[in-house]
C-alpha cells in the first residue's frame, strides 16, 4: 500500500478479510470431553424434549396465573373508555373528563419478571381493547422531549387495520414531526376518523369496537421516572383528554404509596386510580414447583441441596421466577451432560425400550452406581453373581427397578400432599407452611426422625373433630384420584374414618337425649345432687378413660404416621435414583453463585481455564508469552511489592511481548514497534486500574499502588 502523494490527503485502506466466527452448536458439547459416550446425541435429544415440555408447561402456567389479573384490567379499560366518551358529550362533566383513567399495577420486587408480564399484557390489550398500546421505560425518558419522542415513535409503529391507501396517507416522517400533544392529538384524530364504516367485519380489529379506540400507555418502572416529567405529562394530557383518550398503566414494584410520593395532590387529583395486585412471587414459585417437580409428568428431579440452592437464590436475591426456571434448565442440561445414564431419564415405556439396547459400557455404568451397589449387597449370592456378570439379567432387573422407581414417585407425591394437608394449618408450622418446605425436608432425610415431625404428631392429637374431618376430606379427594391399588385401599380407609366420625355425632345425640330424659325423672333434692357430684369426682380421680372420639383421633394419627414411614422414604434410598435426580450442587453453585474475585483472578492468572486455547497452557508460575496483554501485566504485577515502578513494569511487559511476536525486523521500524507495545501496556494498566487492582499514588509520580490481596 503506497501512501506517497504530491499533496496532502487522506488514504483509505480496506481492512483485511476476517473469517466469520462459527458458533459451535450446543449438541457438539455433548460429543466432546470426558463425559462423551456413544449415546450423547440421544441424551441431547432427550434433554431438548423434556425442556420443551417444561417450557410449554411454564408458559401455560404463566397464562393461567395472569388470566384473572388481565381480565380485570381489560374490563377496567373498557369501562373507563366507554364512560369517557359517554361523558365527553356532556359538557357539564368537563371536570370529570380531565381525570385520566389510571391502573396502578403492583407487580412486586421481582423486576426481572416484569418485562414478560407486561409483554403478555400488551398482547392481550392489543387483541381485546385497542391497537394503540405503548410501553415506556424511565431510562429512555430523561426529559419531556424524549418522553414525547418515544411515545410518538411507538404510536407511529402501531398497526391499524385500515385500507392500504389510508395507511399511506397516515404515515408521517418522524423527522418532520414536532413532538407536542397538539400534534399528537391531531395525528390521532386523523387516524381514527379515516376508518371506513363500510369496511367488512372480517377486516376490522378491536379498534373498530369504538369509533375512537383509546391509547394505553404503560410505564414499566414508575419509581424510576423523573418526577417533573411525570407531572408535566399528566397535566398536559389531562387538557387534551377529550381529543386524545389516554389511559395510563403504572408498573409498580414496591407499593402504591409511591404514586403519592412522586405526584403532589394537584397532579394526582387528575388521575382516576384503580389498584390491581399481581400474584405473589412465593405463590408463583409454589405453583411452578407443584407442576414441574412434584409430579410424575416429568421424570427429571432435583436433589435436596440443588433445590435448596435454587430456592435460596429466589428468596434471598431476586424473587425472579424466570431466573429460577433458568436455573432449573441449567440443572437439566448439566444432568444430561454429566450423567451417561441420564439416557434413561424419560417416560417409563421409552426407558424400558432403551434398556434393551444398552451397550456393555452402559451396563458397567449401572453396576458402578452407589445405589445399585447397595441394592446388590442386599441380594442373595446367586442373584449378586447374575447381576454382576450377566448383562441380560441386569437389563431385566433394571427395567423392574425403574418401574418401582416410577411407582415410588407416584405414591411419594400423593402422601406428601396428604401430609401437607395435615401440617399446613398447624400452629407455628413445624414442617413449613408451603409444600416446597416440606418437600425439601423429606428429600434431606427420613422426616419421622426429626423433632419437628414429633411435634406435628402431638399437635394432631389435639385437633378438634371439625378440623380433622376437613383434613381427611381433602386427603380422600387426593387418594381417590389415584389409580394405584395400595393407595386405593388407603382411600377406602379414610372413607371409613369419615363414616366413623359421622356415626359419633349420631351416637352423641342419642346419648344426650337419653341423659336428658333420665335427668328429668331423677329427683333434684340436695341429697341426690351431692351424691351424684361425689360419684363424678371419684370417677375422674380413679381413671381417665378416653372417649370414642379420642380413640378414633389416635387411630387417624397412627394411620397418617404409617403412611409417612412407608411412602416418604428419601430418594437416595431407591436404586437407580441417580438416573433421574441431579445432585451436583457444587457445579450448579459455581454457575449461579458467582464469586467475582475468584473468577477474575482465575481468568487473569490462568486464561486457559476459560479460553481453552492450547497455546495459553503453561506451567504454574510461568507467563505464557501469547496471553492477552492484561494477563501479562497482571502476572507481572503479582511479582511486585506494594508500590510498582511503571518503568520497570513497562520494560518487563515489552520483554514478554517481544518474545511472543515473531515479526520481521524490516516490516516495522523499531520505534514504531516500541510505540505500539507502549500503547498496549498503557491500555493493560488502565484496565487493571478499572478492575481495582492498582491506583495512582502521590508518594511517587512514576509509581502506582497495588491494591490486591496477599500474594494472589
Swiss-Prot record:
Its main location: nucleus. The modification Phosphoserine is found at residues 23, 516. GO terms for molecular function: DNA replication origin binding. Keywords: Chromosome, DNA replication, DNA-binding, Nucleus, Phosphoprotein, Ubl conjugation. Multi-mono-ubiquitinated by OBI1; ubiquitination is important for efficient DNA replication origin site activation. Ubiquitination levels are low in mitotic and early G1-phAse cells and are induced in late G1-/early S-phase, peaking in S-phase and decrease toward the end of the cell cycle. It comes from the Eukaryota. CDD domains: Orc3. Pfam families: ORC3_ins, ORC3_N, ORC_WH_C. InterPro entries: ORC3, ORC3_ins, ORC3_N, ORC_WH_C. Belongs to the ORC3 family. Component of ORC, a complex composed of at least 6 subunits: ORC1, ORC2, ORC3, ORC4, ORC5 and ORC6. ORC is regulated in a cell-cycle dependent manner. It is sequentially assembled at the exit from anaphase of mitosis and disassembled as cells enter S phase. This is Origin recognition complex subunit 3. It comes from Bos taurus (Bovine).
Amino acid at each position: 500500500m503506497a501512501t506517497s502523494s504530491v499533496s496532502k490527503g487522506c488514504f483509505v485502506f480496506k481492512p483485511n478479510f476476517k473469517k466469520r466466527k462459527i458458533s459451535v452448536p450446543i449438541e457438539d458439547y455433548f460429543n466432546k470431553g470426558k463425559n462423551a459416550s456413544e449415546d450423547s446425541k440421544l441424551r441431547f435429544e432427550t434433554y431438548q424434549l423434556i425442556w420443551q415440555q417444561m417450557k410449554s408447561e411454564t408458559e401455560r402456567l404463566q397464562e393461567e396465573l395472569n388470566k384473572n389479573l388481565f381480565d380485570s384490567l381489560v374490563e377496567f379499560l373498557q369501562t373507563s373508555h366507554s364512560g369517557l366518551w359517554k361523558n365527553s358529550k356532556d359538557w357539564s362533566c368537563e371536570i370529570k373528563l380531565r381525570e385520566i383513567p389510571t391502573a396502578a399495577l403492583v407487580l412486586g420486587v421481582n423486576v426481572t419478571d416484569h418485562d414478560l408480564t407486561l409483554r403478555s399484557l400488551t398482547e392481550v390489550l392489543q387483541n381485546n381493547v385497542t391497537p394503540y398500546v405503548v410501553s415506556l421505560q424511565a431510562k429512555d425518558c430523561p426529559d419531556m422531549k424524549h418522553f414525547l419522542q418515544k411515545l410518538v415513535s411507538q404510536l407511529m409503529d402501531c398497526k391499524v387495520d385500515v385500507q392500504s391507501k389510508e395507511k399511506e396517507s397516515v404515515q408521517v416522517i418522524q423527522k418532520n414531526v414536532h413532538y407536542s400533544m397538539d400534534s399528537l392529538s391531531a395525528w390521532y384524530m386523523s387516524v381514527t376518523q379515516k376508518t371506513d364504516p363500510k369496511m367488512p367485519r372480517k377486516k376490522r380489529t378491536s379498534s373498530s369496537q369504538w369509533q375512537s379506540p383509546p391509547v394505553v400507555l404503560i410505564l414499566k418502572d414508575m419509581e424510576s421516572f423523573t418526577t417533573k416529567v411525570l407531572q408535566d405529562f399528566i397535566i398536559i394530557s389531562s387538557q387534551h383528554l377529550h381529543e386524545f383518550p389516554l389511559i395510563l398503566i403504572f408498573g409498580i414494584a414496591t407499593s402504591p404509596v409511591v404514586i403519592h410520593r412522586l405526584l403532589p395532590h394537584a397532579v394526582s387529583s387528575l388521575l382516576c386510580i384503580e389498584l390491581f395486585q399481581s400474584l405473589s412471587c412465593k405463590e408463583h414459585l409454589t405453583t411452578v414447583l407443584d407442576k414441574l417437580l412434584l409430579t410424575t409428568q416429568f421424570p427429571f428431579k432435583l436433589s435436596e441441596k440443588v433445590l435448596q440452592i435454587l430456592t435460596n437464590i429466589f428468596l434471598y436475591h431476586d424473587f425472579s421466577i424466570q431466573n429460577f426456571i433458568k436455573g432449573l434448565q441449567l440443572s437439566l442440561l448439566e444432568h444430561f451432560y454429566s450423567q451417561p445414564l441420564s439416557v434413561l431419564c424419560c417416560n417409563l415405556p421409552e426407558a424400558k425400550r432403551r434398556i434393551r439396547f444398552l451397550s456393555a459400557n452402559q451396563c458397567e455404568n449401572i453396576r458402578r452406581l452407589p445405589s445399585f451397589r447397595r441394592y446388590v449387597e442386599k441380594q442373595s449370592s446367586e442373584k449378586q453373581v447374575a447381576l454382576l456378570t450377566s448383562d441380560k439379567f441386569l437389563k431385566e432387573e433394571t427395567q423392574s427397578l425403574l418401574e418401582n422407581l416410577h411407582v415410588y414417585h407416584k405414591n411419594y407425591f400423593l402422601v406428601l400432599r396428604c401430609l401437607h394437608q395435615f401440617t399446613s394449618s398447624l400452629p407455628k408450622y413445624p414442617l413449613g407452611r408451603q409444600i416446597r418446605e416440606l418437600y425439601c425436608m423429606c428429600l434431606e432425610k427420613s422426616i419421622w426422625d426429626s423433632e419437628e415431625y414429633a411435634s406435628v404428631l402431638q399437635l394432631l392429637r389435639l385437633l378438634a373433630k371439625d378440623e380433622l374431618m376437613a383434613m381427611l376430606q381433602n386427603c380422600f379427594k387426593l387418594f381417590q384420584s389415584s389409580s394405584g391399588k395400595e393407595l386405593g385401599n388407603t382411600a377406602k380407609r379414610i372413607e371409613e374414618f369419615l363414616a366413623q366420625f359421622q356415626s359419633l355425632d349420631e351416637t352423641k345425640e342419642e346419648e344426650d337425649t337419653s341423659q336428658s330424659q333420665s335427668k328429668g325423672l331423677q329427683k333434684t333434692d340436695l341429697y341426690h345432687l351431692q351424691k351424684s357430684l361425689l360419684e363424678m369426682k371419684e370417677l375422674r380421680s380413679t381413671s381417665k378413660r378416653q372417649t370414642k372420639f379420642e380413640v378414633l383421633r389416635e387411630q387417624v394419627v397412627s394411620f397418617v404416621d404409617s403412611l409417612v414411614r412407608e411412602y416418604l422414604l428419601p430418594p437416595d434410598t431407591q436404586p437407580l435414583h441417580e438416573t433421574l435426580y441431579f445432585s451436583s450442587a457444587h457445579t450448579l453453585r459455581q454457575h449461579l453463585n458467582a464469586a467475582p474475585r475468584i473468577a477474575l483472578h482465575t481468568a487473569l492468572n490462568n486464561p486457559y481455564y476459560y479460553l481453552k486455547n492450547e497455546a495459553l497452557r503453561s506451567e504454574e508460575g510461568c507467563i505464557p508469552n501469547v496471553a492477552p496483554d492484561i494477563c501479562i501485566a497482571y502476572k507481572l504485577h503479582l511479582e511486585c511489592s506494594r508500590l510498582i515502578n511503571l518503568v520497570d513494569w513497562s520494560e518487563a511487559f515489552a520483554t514478554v511481548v517481544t518474545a511472543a511476536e515473531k515479526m520481521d525486523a524490516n516490516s516495522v521500524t523499531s520505534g514504531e514497534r516500541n510505540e505500539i507495545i507502549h500503547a498496549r501496556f498503557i491500555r493493560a494498566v488502565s484496565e487493571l486500574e478499572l478492575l481495582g487492582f492498582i491506583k495512582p499514588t502521590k508518594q511517587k509520580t512514576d509509581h502506582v499502588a497495588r491494591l490486591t490481596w496477599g500474594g494472589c
